């Protein structure tokens, strides 16, 4: 072996098999891919456990909240005036329902089907 100026324990890259390098890179890639998949799976499981609890707390807070806030949200969602969403509307429901069932012929028929 010719003296190249390096110490005797040094091996040149020419001696290393190219196939072994590719195997090492594939192994590192597979390990990283499995690690990322496990992390994504863990995050999905944590979200699946967190979301129902969040919804439960939100709905419980909603049920315990003031009726004023419920009326505001209802008026926003249904696009009815805020004044028409109060308890008077609930009290008048029976009267309105009876007036439509007594005289259904007075309702105009548009001929459309849902």
Swiss-Prot record:
One GO BP on record is: transport of virus in host, cell to cell
The topology of this chain with respect to the membrane is: Single-pass membrane protein
For the region Disordered, give the residue spans.
79-114
Q: Main site of residence?
A: host cell
Annotated Gene Ontology cellular components are: host cell plasma membrane; membrane
The biased composition feature labelled Polar residues covers 98-114
Give the UniProt keywords, A-Z: Host cell membrane, Host membrane, Membrane, Transmembrane, Transmembrane helix, Transport, Viral movement protein
Q: Would the keyword Transmembrane turn up in this protein's UniProt record? A: yes
User: Which residue ranges traverse the bilayer?
Assistant: 27-47
Q: Which family does it belong to?
A: Belongs to the nanovirus movement protein family.
What is the protein's given name? Putative movement protein
- Protein's organism: Faba bean necrotic yellows virus (isolate Syrian SV292-88) (FBNYV)
């Amino acid at each position: 072996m010719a003296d190249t100026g390096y110490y005797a324990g040094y091996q040149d890259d020419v001696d290393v098999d190219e196939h072994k390098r590719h195997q090492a890179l594939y192994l590192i890639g597979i390990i990283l891919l499995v690690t990322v998949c496990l992390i994504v799976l863990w995050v999905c499981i944590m979200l699946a456990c967190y979301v129902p609890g969040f919804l439960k707390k939100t709905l419980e807070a909603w049920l315990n909240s003031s009726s004023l806030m419920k009326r505001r949200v209802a008026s926003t969602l249904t696009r009815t005036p805020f004044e028409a969403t109060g308890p008077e509307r609930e009290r008048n429901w029976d009267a309105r329902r009876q007036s439509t069932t007594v005289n259904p012929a007075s309702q105009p028929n548009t001929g459309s089907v849902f």
